[in-house]
Amino acid sequence: MQYVTPDLCDAYPDLVQVVEPLFSNFGGRDSFGGEIVTIKCFEDNSLVKDQVDVDGTGKVMVVDGGGSLRRALLGDMLAEKAARNGWEGLIIYGCVRDVDVLAQTELGVQALASHPMKTDKRGIGDLNVPVTFCGVTFRPGEYVYADNNGIIVSPEPLSMPQ
């Protein structure tokens, strides 16, 4: 499904929250959206690795990496697994790596920046808890939509206006 966030904002101005414009597109899909699944972690992508193995059909993984610019929370191997398992996309409040491969992967990926260093795997983090960054709280079970214009959050699913 192709989402256009300006059109969604125009159609649902009282329903959506707009995330501060700090993110860039790194994935092969410029537009994506779905039900929110959250991960809160810091320089440890163990839970991201676990979740990409789960069926993500219709879902977007929102990863609160604390805004760290020192390690990448997603790379090519995890992105390819996420795409194979039906994830619509990932929004990473942190960094990604292997960006040339990510751009070829059928997956939406938005993040703050790229960084070549991988994370440690210490098994530390929280799954499906509300996370807040860039002026918005992301709650599991709510909905997020992203494109080259930005990222928006809604408490309910949105349809593109006709």
Curated annotation (Swiss-Prot):
Q: What class of enzyme is it?
A: lyase
- Pfam families referenced in this protein's UniProt entry, alphabetically: RraA-like (PF03737)
UniProt remark on cofactor binding: Divalent metal cation.
Named cofactor requirement(s): a divalent metal cation
Give GO terms for biological process: regulation of RNA metabolic process
Q: Where does a divalent metal cation bind?
A: 98
| InterPro entries documented for this protein | RraA, RraA/RraA-like, RraA/RraA-like_sf
Q: Where does substrate bind?
A: 75-78, 97
Keywords noted in UniProt? Lyase, Metal-binding
For this protein, the Enzyme Commission number is 4.1.3.17, 4.1.1.112
Q: MF terms per GO, please?
A: 4-hydroxy-4-methyl-2-oxoglutarate aldolase activity; metal ion binding; oxaloacetate decarboxylase activity; ribonuclease inhibitor activity
According to UniProt, the reaction catalysed is: 4-hydroxy-4-methyl-2-oxoglutarate = 2 pyruvate; oxaloacetate + H(+) = pyruvate + CO2
Say yes or no: keyword Transferase present.
no
Subunit info here reads: Homotrimer.
Assigned protein family? Belongs to the class II aldolase/RraA-like family.
According to its UniProt entry, the function of this protein is described as: Catalyzes the aldol cleavage of 4-hydroxy-4-methyl-2-oxoglutarate (HMG) into 2 molecules of pyruvate. Also contains a secondary oxaloacetate (OAA) decarboxylase activity due to the common pyruvate enolate transition state formed following C-C bond cleavage in the retro-aldol and decarboxylation reactions.
What protein does this entry describe? Putative 4-hydroxy-4-methyl-2-oxoglutarate aldolase
Q: Which organism is it from?
A: Stutzerimonas stutzeri (strain A1501)
